[in-house]
UniProtKB/Swiss-Prot annotation:
Record domain Protein kinase: where: 15-260
Active site annotation, chain numbering: 162
Cellular compartments per GO CC: chromosome, telomeric region; cytosol; EKC/KEOPS complex; nucleus
The keyword Phosphoprotein appears for this protein: yes
PROSITE patterns on file: PROTEIN_KINASE_DOM, PROTEIN_KINASE_TYR
Swiss-Prot/TrEMBL catalytic activity: L-seryl-[protein] + ATP = O-phospho-L-seryl-[protein] + ADP + H(+); L-threonyl-[protein] + ATP = O-phospho-L-threonyl-[protein] + ADP + H(+)
Keywords (A to Z) from UniProt: Activator, ATP-binding, Chromosome, Cytoplasm, Hydrolase, Kinase, Nucleotide-binding, Nucleus, Phosphoprotein, Serine/threonine-protein kinase, Telomere, Transcription, Transcription regulation, Transferase, tRNA processing
Designated name of the protein: EKC/KEOPS complex subunit BUD32
Residue numbers binding ATP: 21-29, 52
InterPro entries xref list: Bud32, Kinase-like_dom_sf, Prot_kinase_dom, RIO_dom, Tyr_kinase_AS
Length: 260
């Protein structure tokens, strides 16, 4: 953790208590119990909120850095706003400061019995490490729901870009997508297939014992939502296209593994 980055975030958010949740290559994520409009009389009750902060990059020219930070923050907020409008499970945007690379959003999730945040990955790990039945109906149902959620995302030609089990949180027994820093829009089956393959590989590497079952249930959920009436024949056509591309992407992945 780089202290000066946290200090910079605090300068951008004076008088706001910040607790670091995670740090990635592009951003820091904080927890706070203060609403950005806390001075409003109707918002005096404190809640839980998440703040994502994109720090400046010292290796970039200041003007270029400022432009990139603003552009990426605006892009992520717009993407999340569209998800909210489409009722695709994702955090609700509360506020944003584009110039400083700050996104303020609702807090999603809960603490598992071991204290870990309720990401899809942590939830599966908790079950596995505590000798729970990882092939139970409840696990199958959750994997199925995750697959449906991703399918709905893709049917609206939206690509996550970093689809791992860490970027899916569980909230009231429903999966919620988070972290859209690499998200994009695309109607290409190839891009949807890569999204699926990234998650498939993440599941295989972090949950190897039950990966076959998890991935099978995920794909069943993904297929199911494509067959819903609201998407008509176009949904089924897109499903055929993406499954064919997924086989191609898997083959390329295996070849890369063989070649090292």
């Amino acid at each position: 953790m780089t202290d000066h980055i946290v200090k910079k975030a605090q300068e951008c958010l004076p008088n706001i208590p910040l607790t670091v949740i995670s740090q990635g290559a592009e951003a820091l994520v904080f927890y706070t119990d203060v609403h950005p409009y806390a001075n409003e009389p109707y918002l005096q009750n404190r809640g839980k909120y998440v703040i994502k902060y994109r720090p400046s990059k010292p290796y970039r020219h200041p003007k270029v850095d400022s432009s990139i930070t603003k552009s990426r923050t605006v892009g992520e907020v717009k993407f999340m706003y569209k998800l909210n409008k489409l009722n695709i499970n994702s955090p609700r945007i509360i506020s944003a400061d584009y110039n400083n690379g700050i996104i303020w959003m609702e807090y999603i999730g809960y603490s598992l019995p071991n204290g870990d945040v309720s990401s899809f990955k942590n939830w599966l790990w908790y079950l596995e490490r505590n000798n729970q039945d990882c092939t139970s109906e409840s696990v199958e149902k959750m994997c199925f729901k995750v697959g449906q959620l991703i399918g709905k995302l893709h049917l609206h030609e939206m690509i996550h870009g970093d689809l791992t089990s860490s970027n899916i949180l569980l909230n009231d027994d429903e999966p919620v997508l988070i972290d859209f820093g690499l998200s994009s829009y695309s109607g290409l089956a190839e891009d949807r297939a890569v999204d699926l393959y990234v998650l498939e590989r993440a599941i295989t590497s972090t949950h190897s014992v039950y990966a076959k079952e998890y991935n099978q249930w995920l794909l069943q959920g993904y297929e199911d939502v494509h067959k819903h009436k609201e998407f008509g024949k176009q949904g089924q056509k897109k499903l055929v296209e993406v499954l064919k591309k997924l086989d191609d992407v898997r083959l390329r992945g295996r070849k890369r593994s063989m070649l090292g």
